[in-house]
Amino acid sequence: MNTVEKWGIFEVSLKGPSAGNPFTEQSVSATFRSKNEIVTVDGFYDGDGVYKVRFMPSFTGDYVYETVGSFPEAESAGDFTVTEPTGNNHGPVRIANTYHFAYEDTTPYYSVGTTCYAWAHQPEEVHKQTLEELDKGYFNKMRFCVFPKHYIHNFRDPETFPYEGTPVDNSNLTEENFSYFVDFSGNNWDFTRFNPEHFRRMERCIVELQERGIEADIIVMHPYDRWGFSVMNREQDDLYWNYVIARFSAYRNVWWSLANEYDLMRAKKLEDWEHYADLLCKKDPYNHMRSIHNCIPFYDHTRPWITHCSLQRQDLYRHVEYTTDYRTRYQKPIVWDEIAYEGNIDMGWGNISGQELTRRFWEASMRGGYAGHGETFMNPEDILWWSHGGKLHGESPARIRFLHEILTQTPGLGLKQGPGAFDETVAVPDEMIPVTGYEIHYYGFGRPSFRNFVKPAGENWRVEVIDTWNMTITDAGVHSGKFRIALPGHEYMAVRLTRV
């Protein structure tokens, strides 16, 4: 009998017709049954006369399935056994305690993400370099696009395109004649015929991230386009959405981002986004994380289909500092996926220091939110992590990994901003409000040489000094009552107090 792990993928492969246009003229689906669940999912055409249906079981035990479709060979049946998960298989990420995340097996998930918009579309050498960096454990979520990207530093064509056809000539593209807005002439696509190889590349990336314990935050649509993918009509969009959902939804580490900078996609209206969201909710039986990302105006994150807020800063100076306000407003996890990138390009969204990006991560985390990384350093190869992946050159990734280690030590699940002085941000466990025995006092760009603390008489508190930049934790002893803790007098320090 076939076996698969709980939250793994069971795939049924069927031979069928290849004549005509199987993407629009044929269909296949399957129903999977066990004593605990009954799930029906759509399949997809994978090219060369092969049709596939994928399923992610949520329980252990015996399953049976039946496939049906528009062609005789689509009718089949079978069974398989689902075994206990192993290794880093903790299931899909879910919302936990309103503002936080946990895997389905209840293991806490503290998001420390990064952005590599077009890494799935790069040559093999760049792809391998990206994986080598990810192996260092800096991040546990990556944002990336299904469609290729047209933007500065992104004039090369991708390795594959999502549709059959030919692209506009890019040989004369330069920074001098680059435009965000193009008329799409010169492209010749058949938007009813997918290129399965393009989507297999995406699936390879999803699996490679999964093997490393990294969530795949898939950006389904985006505005940076010279090929016409951002201005397809509703029928073409629906065909695309259904195909993507059928192919990707069974992977446990998938998150759905309906769009990156949705407000720049002028051809799409509010009713379009709500339509895509409705389709996604109906067709994804696993209820993966769902959001939509802004350039300037936030989407209405109170919408019930949105599981978490995927935010880009709206102000040059103040953004993650609003985390507590947005938690209160939206009653959902706050994920700052774009807060400017470490780098040195000419634009302000891509030239902050590693120290500043690390500070923003800490400010978001201490307020009960989460943040995202990106890197945009100029280099002779014109390979920038924010889009292509490749090699990391910045100083923040190791500090972000260190922060994640601190977050995983939180009692209970998740932090929240607690009461503190005007010149500090104090984080306490969300589950332990109002009485807590755990506090992190973060001083950001302040440079105190000492701090005074007052605790009730008779209570003992273990004190640790955290240097968030040099990544050290120094034991400062056990104290009670009123006491003073010496600090080195430089930025990015924190003091952790734990009642013992």
Regions flagged by a language model, labelled:
Residues 239, 253, 260-395:
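Extracellular glycoside hydrolase catalytic/binding regions
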Residues 43-45, 476-479:
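Short beta-strand segments within Ig-like beta-sandwich modules, predominantly Fibronectin type-III
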Residues 37-98:
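Extended acidic/polar, glycine-enriched regions
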Residues 1-36, 41-44, 79-85, 423-426, ...:
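Non-catalytic, glycine-rich low-complexity segments
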Residues 113-120, 167, 175-178, 193, ...:
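Extended substrate-binding grooves/exosites of carbohydrate-active enzymes
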Residues 34-36, 71, 467-471:
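Solvent-exposed strand-loop boundary residues in beta-sheet-rich modules
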